[in-house]
Amino acid sequence: MDVILTVNGLCKYYKHDKALSGLSLTVPKGAIYGLVGQNGSGKTTLIRLLTGLQKPSDGNFTLYGIRNDEKGIEKARRRMSAIIETPAIYRDMTARDNLRQQYRILGQPSESGIDELLHLVGLGDTGSKKAGHFSLGMRQRLGIAIALAGDPDFLILDEPINGLDPQGIIEMRELILKLNRERQITILISSHILAELSKLATHYGFIDHGHMVKEIDAKELEAACRKCLRLTVSDGKTLATVLDGMQAEYCFLSEKEAEIYSDMRVTKLVCALAEADCEVLSIQEREESLESYYIRLIGGGRYEQAV
């Protein structure tokens, strides 16, 4: 297996806070690697270390076979591009002028590549419209076009769909898949929006409080996820009381929605809830979600998704 990135026992300390604590991971060539973790789990800190914005307190990583403390690491980083938190764009410039500026910074000729990149990210028809008047999704896609100006074969995206509307999420998903499949770009995506990440990733790294809990590929994850009942009710507290009384294994996805993993008769459960004056709004059999799998990995509780 060809490997783009290997992280070995990486640590980052801020006074008394451990942002990363012995984190290790491997990103195979050609993968869409989903870095899964709640806000504050260390995802953005890792990306800052990989891009050279910060230095690790301990441990190391290898990028294209070059260790981060070796002379060739900056050359290796030129094969990588990253968008951290929000894309750096000039809001008073058009999409085309933003790309021209990026090519100037890189010291590369620009005109031949601009039209191709604008078309690739779906911004070919924006004309004289300034980036400041773009939607959030358009600005995110412009950020990716700027990141692609140096022709990288490894792209790091930090929360690329955070804050996007449904149409923007679909457009971003299609773009990420196109970059991976048609341009063979390896992509590392940091995200806490797991329902969307599950539609993209070929590999996953689940992190919690700065350390790696588990690495797994998509096929292994599919095999590991269990059958379950997904239930939406009128009163989540009553549902929990009923399930506890039945000694059921369950996980809440939201205040009134839960996945139940115990083997039980649906009619028995519905009757018990009716007796407790808890209305069942929806019930369906399905595979365990990526979200509940992560909750199970880190030991229970509810997965908190900041909006």
Question: Can you say where each PLM-predicted feature lies in the sequence?
Answer:
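Short, charged/small-residue-rich alpha-helical element at the C-terminal edge
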Residues: 227-297
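Conserved ABC ATPase "signature" region
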Residues: 100, 111-126
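Helix-to-loop junction immediately C-terminal to a conserved catalytic motif
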Residues: 51
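Conserved ABC transporter NBD signature motif
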Residues: 59-69, 75-76
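Helical segment within the ABC ATPase nucleotide-binding domain
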Residues: 170-183
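Catalytic Walker B motif of ABC-type/P-loop ATPase nucleotide-binding domains
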Residues: 155-159
